Every structure is written in C-alpha cells, then in structure tokens.
C-alpha cells in the first residue's frame, strides 16, 4: 500500500492523503454476493433519531462476507482483492475447489493467486481459519469468534489483530489491541495473521465534503445549543459549559465507563482500563 499526498491545487486538495493500491480489483463487486443496502439516516422504525450525525452519503451495495469460515478442508484460491465501502478492511474473493465463491476479510500479505483453507487440519498460515485449540500459543490472529459458529466479531477492522496468550481447559486467553485479555472458548475460530490495509489510519480525508460523502453529518457543540437541547446550552454570549462534559442526556462523556453486560464480566481476565506495566 502506498500513500499519495495531493498537490495543493485547491483548499480541498491541500490536506488530502489517500492510499494508492495497484493490486485492488478495478471492476464491480461479485453480483451473487452483493445486495442492496437501504439507508435509515440514524432513524428507527418510528422515524425517531436513535443515532445522531448520520444521513446522506453515497449509495453503497453491501458485500456478503463469510465470517464463519466453516467450509472445511476445501482449498480456496484468492481470485481478487477488492475495496469495500462498508468497512475499513479490504475483501478477498475466494473461489473454492468446488466452484463456490465467498468474500472474506483480506489478511495482511495475502496475494492474488494464493490459497487458503479452513478447518482444524489446516496449516498455520496467513489467511487460514482454524479453531483456537489448533492454533499455537503466541500466534497473531484476527477475525475471532466469541461463540463457536456465530461468526467473527473481534479484530475485523483494518490493521487490527490480537494475540493468543495461553490455553487452559476449555478456554484460551487472548490479548486484544486495547490491552484487554479475554477468555474465549477453544472451539471458536480465528484467522491467522493480521487484517490488511494497516495504513488506513494514516489517510487524511482533507475536506468536510468528503466526510459528507461517507454519510456523516456535522456535530454541533453542546455549548452552542439552547438549554432545552443540551445540559451545556444557554447563557448570554459565549460561555463555558459550567460543569463536567456530559452527553445531551447527562451521561459523563469523557472517560466514564458504560459497560453494563454483567453476564460476561467473568470472561475478562484483565480490563483494558488497568494500568499497563
């Protein structure tokens, strides 16, 4: 992946830094694994805003990605690597030996023409998906399941990965990028290696309009609102918030913990908030 800085021919181009990837497929996505994606602009079925700052943007088609990787012991060839507008990672289109095609998250260093395989008997090689019980301790992994057969939920974005730290009984300990160490069942599957497009965070959008193309609307500061709209609102002229930063609903917005899932708290061996020593 190469980063390209645009010449400052206009204010909008001055700060643009985008990736240039010659290996990406230039054509349309595979139609059998593509479906329409309807925008809801952050509204629920009643038309009320449930997620702020969402609306507009370019139309996207959704690519159906195989997160389960349960087609075992059949080698698959990487036909092409594609851009996906719905996520930061790239997609790899696999063609299995029986002719079936599936999209997967493209791992780092995976190339067109290489082969990957799923299953417990697969070699420990970048792009292969195995149950955690068959992965050596210390391996770097991504696309990790939280429940066996449910599909990958952890370490799916560009450049992300985790590390298998230990195995004890029916559970393994996996260290995530946040520093959290979490117990995951050894029958859950994970993919070897880290996710590709690792320089995604080094890109610069460059102008406000490009953010709107992505379907993101402006964020208004609370102190610029009226008291009816935000706890920080109101006052004559330019004023400070007058209290610690909070959300429009009064929840502390800087550093307050919001996790409420007590059911799985015993699966966390080390919190992401603990001091890193």
Swiss-Prot record:
Instruction: Recite the UniProt keywords alphabetically.
Output: Ribonucleoprotein, Ribosomal protein, RNA-binding, rRNA-binding
Q: Which species is the source of this protein? A: Nitrosomonas eutropha (strain DSM 101675 / C91 / Nm57)
TM ranges: none
Q: What is this protein called?
A: Large ribosomal subunit protein uL2
Naming one, the record's GO cellular component terms include: large ribosomal subunit
Region (Disordered): which ranges? 223-264
One of the record's GO molecular function terms? structural constituent of ribosome
Q: How does it assemble?
A: Part of the 50S ribosomal subunit. Forms a bridge to the 30S subunit in the 70S ribosome.
Spell out the family assignment given in the record's similarity comment.
Answer: Belongs to the universal ribosomal protein uL2 family.
Annotated GO biological process: cytoplasmic translation
Top-level taxon of the source organism: Bacteria
- Describe the task this protein carries out: One of the primary rRNA binding proteins. Required for association of the 30S and 50S subunits to form the 70S ribosome, for tRNA binding and peptide bond formation. It has been suggested to have peptidyltransferase activity; this is somewhat controversial. Makes several contacts with the 16S rRNA in the 70S ribosome.
The UniProt entry, under InterPro entries, shows: NA-bd_OB-fold, Rib_uL2_dom2, Ribosomal_uL2, Ribosomal_uL2_bac/org-type, Ribosomal_uL2_C, Ribosomal_uL2_CS, Ribosomal_uL2_dom3, Ribosomal_uL2_RNA-bd_dom
